[in-house]
From Swiss-Prot:
Keywords assigned: Membrane, Transmembrane, Transmembrane helix
Primary subcellular site in the record, as a coarse category: membrane
Family indicated by similarity: Belongs to the OST5 family.
InterPro entries named in the record: TMEM258/Ost5 (IPR007915)
UniProt-recorded name of the protein: Dolichyl-diphosphooligosaccharide--protein glycosyltransferase subunit OST5
Organism whose genome encodes this protein: Dictyostelium discoideum (Social amoeba)
Membrane topology listed for this record: Multi-pass membrane protein
GO biological process: response to endoplasmic reticulum stress
Function: Subunit of the oligosaccharyl transferase (OST) complex that catalyzes the initial transfer of a defined glycan (Glc(3)Man(9)GlcNAc(2) in eukaryotes) from the lipid carrier dolichol-pyrophosphate to an asparagine residue within an Asn-X-Ser/Thr consensus motif in nascent polypeptide chains, the first step in protein N-glycosylation. N-glycosylation occurs cotranslationally and the complex associates with the Sec61 complex at the channel-forming translocon complex that mediates protein translocation across the endoplasmic reticulum (ER). All subunits are required for a maximal enzyme activity.
UniProt key word Ribonucleoprotein: no
Length: 76
């Protein structure tokens, strides 16, 4: 039984595009999180909104970093 080489489900050409998109989305949610933290009064803060913004920003920036590494030739 011959081994079949692994091929990525996403073409290598799209790594920089995905890196850019995920980083932009992550920074947008991060900026929204920071602005909401600075402008909302302490009594009006909503923990679920804050956690949602932080989670989306964190996951998007993590995926963006992953694709930046892949685009740079560092295969993790």
């Amino acid at each position: 039984m011959a081994l079949v080489p692994y091929t990525s489900p996403l073409d290598i050409v799209f790594y920089p595009v995905c890196a850019f998109l995920f980083c932009v989305i992550g920074f947008a949610f991060f900026a929204t999180f920071i602005v909401s933290e600075m402008t909302t009064a302490k009594a009006q803060k909503n923990i679920f909104r804050e956690l949602t913004l932080a989670l989306i920003a964190s996951m998007s920036l993590g995926l963006g970093l992953f694709f930046v590494l892949l685009a740079g030739g560092i295969y993790v």
